[in-house]
Amino acid sequence: MAKSSLDKKFDKIREREESKSFSTKKRSRIVSKFVNNRLAVFGLIIFSIILLATIFAPLLSPYDPMRVDLRSMRQSPSLDHWFGTDNTGRDVFTRVLFGGRVSIFIGLGSAILSALVGIAVGCYAGYKGGWIDLIALRISEIFMSFPQIILVLLLVSITGQSLFNLMAIFILTGWGGMYRLARARMLSLREEEYVQALRSFGLSTFTICYKHMLPNALSPIMVNITLSTAMFILTEAGLSFLGLGVPLNIPTWGNILNVAQDILVLQNYWWMWGPVGVVISVFVLCVNFIGDGLRDSTDPSQQG
């Protein structure tokens, strides 16, 4: 006897549940492929070292990052001050560690929060379609039609300088890319048979979108978050170098670089800006290595 339509739908759900073991094997292959990527592993190791160094900064340096010591102004690197001191005698190594806390918090926090906004809107709009999708798409197009740095500069001049204002601006200008990524994935998945079966059983839109469909889009989302983290860290550094980012009384990698605006410092006191410039470059490079590793390991065309 031929199966009824209801039985076929049950079969689709059952196949979906049975595929979990396959998904576990697939995740194992992804991890194995990532581990075999030397650049990705190298990036992850250096990323972890820098991150842990910033977290445990008080244990690694006896100095206060904001303490002024006029007797130690502009000292070159030594055993007492590994990266030297700045114009007011503050230890540069300490400021790089504590500044990394803020810069990484801004970059990673903005990337994750903008991703959450983009995912929430993109999944719902892509699944439901209609006027909700149209409005969300047009709003994202408005934000993405401007060069991001110009839009950020404009919004900073309106809202003023503060750490959380800058993060809010990054989220506002950065959610569009993740929205379009999530939306495209939902558009391709919503006609799948298992989604139609779930819909026929009366499951809520939230359950279908975020519990059953979203896990299939996590791979490109993770890659996008890593790349956004690097972009936001570089943007913060550039804005703070210009004096338009985080207030100067808060140590960040960009604020430490700010001293390089002085041609005297640029030419004669390389330790005030050189080490932090290297740290920014290495950290962003490692984040990009991690992103490339995630992309390669999750690319279906390269799966064995």
Segments and roles (model prediction):
Residues 90-105, 109, 129-137, 190-191, ...:
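Amphipathic cytosolic juxtamembrane alpha-helices at the membrane-cytosol interface
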Residues 50, 123, 153-157, 166, ...:
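Transmembrane alpha-helix boundary and packing residues in multipass membrane permease domains
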Residues 155-158, 170, 185-186, 235-279:
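Glycine-rich helix-loop "coupling/hinge" segments at transmembrane-helix boundaries
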Residues 57-65, 126-130, 156-161, 173, ...:
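Short helix-capping/hinge motifs at transmembrane helix termini and TM-loop junctions
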Residues 1-115, 119, 131, 245, ...:
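Gly/Trp-centered helix-boundary motif
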Residues 82, 116-118, 126-189, 222:
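Generic hydrophobic transmembrane alpha-helix motif, especially the helices
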Residues 45-46, 103-118, 145-156, 215, ...:
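Hydrophobic alpha-helical transmembrane segments in multi-pass membrane proteins
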Residues 118, 122, 202, 215-217, ...:
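Conserved G/P- and acidic residue-centered "switch" motifs that form tight phosphate/ATP-binding loops
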